[in-house]
Every structure is written in C-alpha cells, then in structure tokens.
Amino acid sequence: MASPALISETEAWKDLKAHLEGIKRTHLRELMGDTERCQSMMVEFDNIFLDYSRQQAIPDTIKKLYKLADAAHLKQKIDRMYNGDHINSTENRSVLHVALRAPRDSAICSDGKNVVPDVWNVLDKIKDFSDRVRNGSWIGATGKELKDVIAVGIGGSFLGPLFVHTALQTDPEASKNARGRELRFLANVDPIDVARNISGLNPETTLVVVVSKTFTTAETMLNARTLREWISSALGPTAVAKHMVAVSTNIPLVEKFGIDPNNAFAFWDWVGGRYSVCSAVGVLPLSLQYGFAVVEKFLQGAHSIDQHFSSAPFEKNIPVLLGLLSVWNVSFLGYPARAILPYSQALEKLAPHIQQVSMESNGKGVSIDGLPLPFESGEIDFGEPGTNGQHSFYQLIHQGRVIPCDFIGVVKSQQPVYLKGEVVNNHDELMSNFFAQPDALAYGKTPEQLKNENVAEHLIPHKTFTGNRPSLSILLPTLDAYRIGQLLAIYEHRVAVQGFVWGINSFDQWGVELGKSLATQVRKQLHGSRVKGEPVEGFNFSTKTLLTKYLEATSDVPADPSTLLPNI
C-alpha cells in the first residue's frame, strides 16, 4: 500500500493524537517524581548532556514519536541527504552542508561527483590567504598590514558567521590569536549600518570580504559599492584589488567589480545560505580574525555531530530527539514558539542565527508535494542569554503563554572570575539560575504553598505559578571552537528532522521572494519621482499615500547627487 501523502494521515500521527489527552491531564510535578522516567530521558554524547525529562511526555510518548519518525521515513531521508540526493526538490539541488566539514579523505557525492576535494581546495586557499594576511605578507595598497576586516553579506551570509565570531571572541585561544585585529559584519542596506561599520577604521588597514553567491544580491552589492567608494576615494581605484576579496561563484561579475578573480573563494549550489557558515562564507572572515587552526577545530566539532546524527540510533541521537520533541510541542501540544536560552554571554547571537535557520527552513504551509498542511508546523524562535532574559521576557514564560524552552549551560566558563569573600563565583551564580529556572517552570507554585508561607490572600492569585511548562537542558563541558561547531550542527540537524517529519522542504525559501519583487517596483517609482517628477501610480491607496508622504518629506534629496559617504 502506498504511503499517505501527508504525515498527519498516518496511523502513527493518529496514535499520538489519541495519546495526547492523557498527557494533558498529567502535571510535570507528577512526572518529575518518576526517577526511572527521568533517567530514560537523559542522553550523553561526547560529554554533551541532554536532559529532556521536563518535557510533557512519558516513555510511551517517545516510543510513539519513534514510530512517527518511521512513518515519515526519517532515517531514509537523512541517508538521502548524506548521499547527495536532490532533496531540495523545488530547486533540484542536493543539500550537503555536511560536506563542508568532512575530513579531507571523505567521499560525499553530488550528481555522481565527490565534492570533498573541491571543499578542501577552497579551505586550503583560505588557509593560505588568511595566513598571508595575518603574517603581513599580504599588505594593503600603501604597504600597511590589513588588521581589520569587514564582511559584507546578508541573511545566512551574516547571521551564522556573526554567531561563531561572537562565541569565539572570549575563548582564550581564539582571543589570543585575534589580538590587535577586528572583524565587523555589514548586513543591512540602511546607511547607518555602513556608518557604524566604517567608524574608527582606516581604509589603509581594512580588508573587505564581499559575500554573494551570484554577486547580484541587491543589498549586499550596494553595500559593496559603498565600501569600494570608501576605499577608492581614500586610496585610489587601483587599491580595490588589494583591499577587497569575494566569496562568490560569479567570477565575471567579481572581475567586473574590480576584484582580482584569483581572490574569489567559491561555494556551491548545494549549500543553502543559512547553512553556509562552514563554507568560505564563514570560514574566510573567521580565519582572518582567529587563524585557520581555530576555525578548523570548529569544523571538526560540527563534523563530529554530523557523524553522530547519521549513525546513532534514534534513542541516543541528540538532533533526532530534539527534532521529534519540537514536532510534539508544535503539532500536538499546540505550542507555536520556542525560547533558546543559553546561559553564556558568548552565545548571545545563537538565537538570532537559529531563528533564521529554523524559521526560514520550516516556515512552510505546504508539503514537499505541494499539498496544504492541515496541521501546525514551524516554530517561532527567539531568545536571549541568561540571566538577562530573566529580567525581560521570562515573566510571560512563567505566568503567561506556555513556551517550551531550551536551556543551554556550559560547565567551564571561557573567562572565570573569582572574588574573595563571595558566597559563589560569578559562573556559579550564573549556573545557579540555569539549574533553577527549568524547575520553576515545571513545578510552579501552588496557592496552598503560598498560604503556608502566609502570603496575603489578595496576592495569592498574582503569585501563583501554574507550572507544567516544558523545557529541556543541554549541558556543554566547555565552549571552545570545537564545542561551538557541535552546537551549531545539533541545531542545524534538529531543524532538518522537524522538516523531514512534517514532510516539507526545509531547504528552499520562496517566502523571501515576493517582497523583493515588489521592492523592485517601488525602487523604480522612487527613481522616476525623484529624477523625472513622475506621480506615484500603480499602487493601492495605502501604499500610494505612504510613498507620497515619504517623497514629499524628502523633496530636498538631490535627483542626481554627487557621492556622499558617512561622516562619523
């Protein structure tokens, strides 16, 4: 018999729906009292410890989720990804970000060709170039060393590398290697972002990395042209060849722009933007800042999880477990959001990156076969490091909406601080909150407990915590380059698991196209109105009104201005 077209039509899905009612009637206070249950919901791999015992689930729930995974052919879909099959069916592409961190002697094929040698050709080129920049053998147009780097890109070309950069900044080895150097990321087309990025930098000591696969991305190329003008106005047009390099596959446009094609670093159609941090997109700027050896450890960490994901049985497979639990929370328990709460300031850019990886991947309304989904899929992801988030949005998580939480802790701080006479050190203070918050969410506080504490009657409703709010805890031993790579890969594969089970294409992003095409029409109107005085036409009443107000308020903007760069 043919498999159902939608996962929700399978017996495994219906079985979980029937199972749901019993779970809803059981409070986490009761579930957490079952030591055997809790122990069965703890998994460890390579000193990464996952505790999902505070999920609204029992061992039977997990078994039923495994059956759902089987009904969705999860293992076969994972294998197809690793085998280079064109699982991105709407764009007819392989999905092979795992090849970006594979060892040199690996064989991972796309369209019958082993792509790993191509990957390592680029990695070797990055190592050579970054070494030359860092040791001063590659210098700028005026003979000065290039100590500062601005990486120009948007979306996946920005959020992933920024996450890794921020996480590495205070790692002892990485920070030592980065001494005297600066790495900045220019993403937004807003001129304020340009102004802030070039503020305090000297064009003579600055290298610009332009990241655009096609070299046609509107925002990125406008920012690249702006920085080209910043460099050439200070150093002359020939300086561009020494101060700008590219990550792109469009060599003719790279050369036309003024960048030496020998200084273009390739990546491939089988790398999606949000999965590209392990390609030249991230490896080049990160190697310029921290040295290739540090970045190679990051790649090795990601690869270790790639191996774990592809080979570990589901009951011990961290990304699979996380993905299945997300499906359970979203599609069955009806919780649309997820809070990513790292108790490490070094991970402050994790949530924004995973927000893109998750929401751009799984924010789909139809199946991979084009059928409308009759169930909720995708998650609204947000987060903030602890304990900052506790003084921000935790109020809602404790007493408002139920939002499943990922608590991420690190056993050993990158930068320990000890003060004589304090009850605990700074990291212990942080971790006290990491251990306390999941229990506060799970157990809550009852009116009876408050009465026993002699809380005033009129305050009891306000101080009651219902509890029964799910979370999971991930404990990392350290936060060095290797562990950062592992954490990245765990979340990447978790997102893939969700998409594989929901039966959607997690590797296209057609939702970003419509707004871009409409912006082209607006851009044409703004040009016509400023240069030729054309009236605003062809828009609905609301947009026409807004555009007219904008044009009237900016009537002093010259139609054909001379170049003006930020002055900050």
UniProtKB/Swiss-Prot annotation:
Its main location: cytoplasm. Keywords: Cytoplasm, Gluconeogenesis, Glycolysis, Isomerase. It is an enzyme of class 5 (isomerase). Pathway: Carbohydrate degradation; glycolysis; D-glyceraldehyde 3-phosphate and glycerone phosphate from D-glucose: step 2/4. PROSITE patterns: P_GLUCOSE_ISOMERASE_1 (PS00765), P_GLUCOSE_ISOMERASE_2 (PS00174), P_GLUCOSE_ISOMERASE_3 (PS51463). The keyword Isomerase applies. GO terms for biological process: gluconeogenesis; glucose 6-phosphate metabolic process; glycolytic process. Coiled coil: none annotated. This is Glucose-6-phosphate isomerase, cytosolic 1.
